[in-house]
Structure formats: C-alpha cells, structure tokens
Regions:
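Acidic, serine/proline-rich low-complexity intrinsically disordered regions
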Residues: 2-247
Length: 247
C-alpha cells in the first residue's frame, strides 16, 4: 500500500488489548492524546496507550477508559474552545458519540503496519486526500460497489471516526480531521484520515495493485487536464494572432 500510493508515512496497525500485560518492544506512553500516539506510530514507533497515559478526556471516553468530564458532557467545554456557540449543540455531539463500553479494553497498541508482529484489529491511514481516495475505491470494490458512507462530527477524527466506528460497525470510515488532531499533531492541511477493519486489508491491497496498472497512474498524469490546457492555449494563441492582424 505504501509503495503503490507513495504514502509519506506508514499505515498504522491498531490492537485493542483486554489485559494490562506488557507489550514486548512497545513504549508505554504517558500524557499523550490518541491522535499523538497515532502520529508516533505512523512515523515508525511502536507504542501503547492505556487509561493512565491517555490525556484527552474525549478520547478516554471513546475507548471506555473514563467517563466524560462534566464540562464536556454539558457542552461547556466546546463553547470554551470556540468550536460551537451553543452548549446544547456540543451536548448533542457527545451524546451521539460512538464509543466502547466502559472497561471493554485496557490498552491500545499502535505500531507501523509494515513491522507488524501481531495481527491488528484495525488499520488507520493518515495522508494526503488524493492518496486516501484510492484506498476508499479499493474498499468499495471489495464491498461489491456499495457506496462508502462517512460518519463524523468533525470532532475526534482519529479516535472515533477512524478507530472506534470502524471497529464497532466493521466498515471503513473516513474523516477530514478535527480541531483536536490538527492542533495536537503534525497533520498537514491537505491530509485526512481513515480506518478500516484489518480483515479487509488483503482485498484492498489486491485492488490497489489492479488500480496501479492503469487508473491510478493515468489519473495522476492529468491527461484530460493537459488536453484542455493545450486546447485553451491554442485558442489564446489564435485570438492573439487575429488581434495582431486587426481582425
């Protein structure tokens, strides 16, 4: 996948662990948001995040580590951040937030997929939008052409949109990012994020190989745009010649 699409960083494997057993070779993170743990994994690091180490209260609730603090549950927090102007809007956003049951998992293991020693539950990819569309197309092919839906609140893009939703609903979901992950990580303006159950990976890779034979390089070559540009330049040249001739 990385070679075909030219991903700038690696795709990330995510495992939900139901015990507190140490993960060999992985660094236990402290005072990290989930999006920051994902950032470190996409840059090649093998990391683990648990209830003690996760610093984002919204993500902590999403993974069933801790209840939402009162300020977020009532909506006051998002008003304070300047994200929404009405508490009832934020309250509704959190009320409808997909989440794991409290205590369902104990740890989250994130690692570069290319260095995987265990099968992940999920694969999360963060990169430029153009690169992600091919993954979505390959996934759609694996689903027999079924249109791909996205579920987002433009909040919790990595933890909920790209991890919890794919896990609970057993499908790909994508997001353009959110206030939190764009503030807390190196996510670039033109990047987005998606996640899908790892069981879909073989079919996605197979169709990416197929796309790479014709559709992908042809699209990136912008042949239709080049033809239009050439035609427009020809019209401009002809117009200039007529102007010079006094026609």
């Amino acid at each position: 996948m990385k070679a075909i699409l030219g991903l700038s960083t690696t795709q990330v494997g995510v495992r939900f662990l139901t015990t507190n057993d140490a993960v060999e070779g992985a660094e236990m993170l402290d005072k990290h948001r989930y999006c920051q743990a994902l950032m470190r994994a996409r840059h090649g690091q093998n990391v683990v995040l648990d209830a003690k180490g996760i610093s984002c209260p919204a993500a902590a609730r999403a993974f069933g580590f801790r209840p939402l603090p009162e300020s977020l549950r009532t909506g006051k927090g998002l008003v304070g951040f300047g994200i929404v102007s009405e508490e009832k809007v934020a309250e509704e956003m959190f009320k409808k937030m997909p989440h794991l049951e409290m205590g369902a998992i104990q740890q989250i293991h994130l690692f570069p997929l290319e260095k995987a020693e265990q099968l992940p539950d999920l694969v999360v990819v963060e990169d430029e939008v153009e690169k992600l569309i091919w993954i979505i197309l390959a996934y759609m092919h694996a689903q027999g052409g079924e249109r791909v839906q996205s579920n987002t609140a433009v909040l919790q893009a990595t933890c909920v949109d790209s991890t919890v939703i794919p896990y609970l609903e057993k499908r790909l979901n994508f997001s353009f990012g959110c206030y939190g992950c764009r503030d807390a990580t190196d996510m670039a303006p033109g990047e987005a994020v998606l996640g899908f159950p790892a069981s879909f990976l073989p079919d996605i890779i197979e169709h990416l190989d197929y796309l790479n034979k014709k559709a992908l390089p042809h699209s990136r070559g912008k042949h239709a745009f080049a033809a239009l540009k050439k035609e427009l330049e020809g019209e401009q040249t002809a117009h200039a010649h007529r102007y010079e001739a006094g026609l």
